[in-house]
């Protein structure tokens, strides 16, 4: 049984040292240079007393130094916590404390003093000018050891740390390669944040495959199209809003592109039809932080025939649909359950959540769906109430808990509303103790929530719709509203 592997970056630098690992802005970095830069950062972190077994959080925008930081953690034997740059300070502080992080790697674009009372903050730009401490790097990765921790909001509204092992990341990369293929010409463009699994997973594919990553700090349709043509990019990870922008900007898919891996929810028919007309090879997918990226993928040849399907499981992965403890027949609706070597080890320090989420080795996703008679998966509802806005996940319970802490709010319900630009945005439905303005509630949320989680509109109700068990019926909120707060 495979229990350990040589450090991926170390071995890749030995195998193909002069091959291009990373292109970022005007920087071109070979695998040998990537290893040297990451090892140097590891030695500089060691001079700050970062040691094997520690936990370090990373709060950085997409940039070369973030890539170095992730690999430096692995070379030190340190668990890396990837923090979402869009979150509020309040949200990040919770994750730092909950994860047991002792160090925070960041830069001048973030206010370090806001975190100094609970962690040692290290500015990576200052760090790279400092002296280093000679270390013995961790030459091997233990497959069952936690490599990264990413936080995902749960239905209770409290974020949970997803423990992703080296084995999870490795088998995710291998399963993806068996599905999408690999060529020596492949270059994968990432304009999604590296703190999301869809972005981070490409870094690991890079060192495992020996493939170039073309990294962008953020998505700009003109910059991405220029980069695709300049660097002959063959693959790109995207969400629906990115794909729509690319389609608006060009009449034909760039010749070098062979795969657009689409995440963040099923694509609508008009978008898929336009992709087919313009020759965009879209691979729809279904996955989550807990599965270390995609676990189900639909190839372009099935995109119209199996409209709305997320596809079939990757090699070594399994899916099934269950309802009331019984496996469902084809087309019968139930909960999607997944199993495979890329499925997370567990939620960090969440015993009750782990007991509720795992059943005989299967992960209960909380998503509803069905399989057709050929085994293609159709996702009916993303974790029933999840709002996907511009590729970002918004859990109503998390937003509701913030609104309920406001003195004017007696009850709160949040659901998604269609939005032309973002796909969906959150709307809040409130029962009030006393009058309050939408502006006051927006300002209150700004201090406690990421910008994309703040409700776009607030509505007043006499009472929230609930079932006999007093469970909030979010799908009925829109019909129960009385008037909009201004």
UniProtKB/Swiss-Prot annotation:
Its EC number is 6.2.1.26. It is an enzyme of class 6 (ligase). InterPro entries: AMP-bd_C, AMP-bd_C_sf, AMP-binding_CS, AMP-dep_synth/lig_dom, ANL_N_sf, ATP-dep_AMP-bd_enzyme, MenE. GO terms for biological process: menaquinone biosynthetic process. The keyword NAD does not apply. One of its GO terms (molecular function) is o-succinylbenzoate-CoA ligase activity. Pfam families: AMP-binding (PF00501), AMP-binding_C (PF13193). Pathway: Quinol/quinone metabolism; 1,4-dihydroxy-2-naphthoate biosynthesis; 1,4-dihydroxy-2-naphthoate from chorismate: step 5/7; Quinol/quinone metabolism; menaquinone biosynthesis. It catalyses: 2-succinylbenzoate + ATP + CoA = 2-succinylbenzoyl-CoA + AMP + diphosphate. Keywords: ATP-binding, Ligase, Menaquinone biosynthesis, Nucleotide-binding. Belongs to the ATP-dependent AMP-binding enzyme family. MenE subfamily. Converts 2-succinylbenzoate (OSB) to 2-succinylbenzoyl-CoA (OSB-CoA). This is 2-succinylbenzoate--CoA ligase. It comes from Bacillus subtilis (strain 168). The lineage of its organism: Bacteria, Bacillati, Bacillota, Bacilli, Bacillales. The gene is menE.
């Amino acid at each position: 049984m495979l229990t350990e592997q040589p450090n991926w970056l170390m071995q890749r630098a030995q195998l193909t040292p002069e091959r291009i690992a990373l292109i970022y802005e005007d920087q071109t970095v070979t695998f040998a240079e990537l290893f040297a830069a990451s090892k140097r950062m590891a030695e500089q972190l060691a001079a700050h007393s970062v040691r094997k077994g520690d936990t370090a959080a990373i709060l950085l925008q997409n940039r070369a130094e973030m890539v170095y930081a992730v690999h430096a953690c692995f070379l030190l034997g340190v668990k890396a916590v990837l923090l979402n740059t869009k979150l509020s300070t309040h949200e990040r502080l919770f994750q730092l404390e909950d994860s047991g992080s002792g160090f925070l790697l960041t830069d001048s674009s973030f206010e370090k003093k806001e975190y100094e009372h609970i962690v040692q903050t290290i500015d990576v730009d200052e760090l790279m000018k400092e002296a280093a401490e000679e270390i013995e790097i961790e030459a091997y990765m233990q497959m069952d050891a936690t490599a990264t921790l990413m936080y995902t909001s749960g239905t209770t509204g409290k974020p949970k740390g997803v423990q992703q092992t080296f084995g999870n990341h490795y088998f995710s990369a291998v399963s993806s390669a068996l599905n999408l293929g690999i060529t020596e010409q492949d270059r994968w463009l990432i304009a999604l944040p590296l703190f999301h699994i869809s972005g981070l997973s490409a870094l690991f594919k890079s060192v495992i495959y020996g493939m170039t990553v073309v990294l962008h700090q953020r998505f700009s349709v003109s910059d991405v199209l220029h980069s695709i043509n300049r660097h002959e990019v063959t693959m790109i990870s995207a969400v629906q809003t990115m794909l729509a922008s690319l389609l608006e900007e060009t009449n034909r898919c760039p010749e070098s592109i062979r795969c657009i891996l689409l995440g963040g929810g099923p694509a609508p028919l008009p978008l898929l039809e336009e992709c087919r007309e313009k020759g965009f090879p879209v691979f729809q997918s279904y996955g989550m932080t807990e599965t270390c990226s995609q676990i189900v993928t639909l190839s372009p040849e099935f995109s119209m025939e199996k409209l709305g399907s997320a596809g079939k499981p990757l090699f070594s992965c399994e899916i099934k649909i269950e309802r009331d403890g019984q496996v469902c027949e084809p087309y019968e609706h139930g909960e999607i359950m997944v199993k495979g070597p890329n499925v997370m080890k567990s939620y960090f320090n969440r015993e009750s959540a782990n007991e509720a989420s795992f059943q005989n080795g299967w992960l209960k996703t909380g998503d509803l769906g069905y399989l057709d008679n050929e085994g293609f998966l159709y996702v009916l509802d993303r974790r029933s109430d999840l709002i996907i806005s511009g590729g970002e996940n918004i859990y109503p319970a998390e937003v509701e808990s913030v609104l309920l802490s406001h003195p004017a709010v007696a009850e709160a319900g949040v659901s998604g509303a269609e939005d032309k630009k973002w796909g969906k945005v959150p709307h809040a439905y409130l029962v009030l103790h006393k009058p309050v303005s939408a502006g006051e509630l927006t300002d209150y949320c700004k201090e406690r929530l990421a910008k994309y989680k703040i409700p776009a509109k607030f509505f007043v109700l006499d009472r929230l719709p609930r079932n006999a068990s007093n469970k909030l019926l979010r799908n009925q909120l829109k019909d129960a509203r009385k008037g909009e707060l201004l």
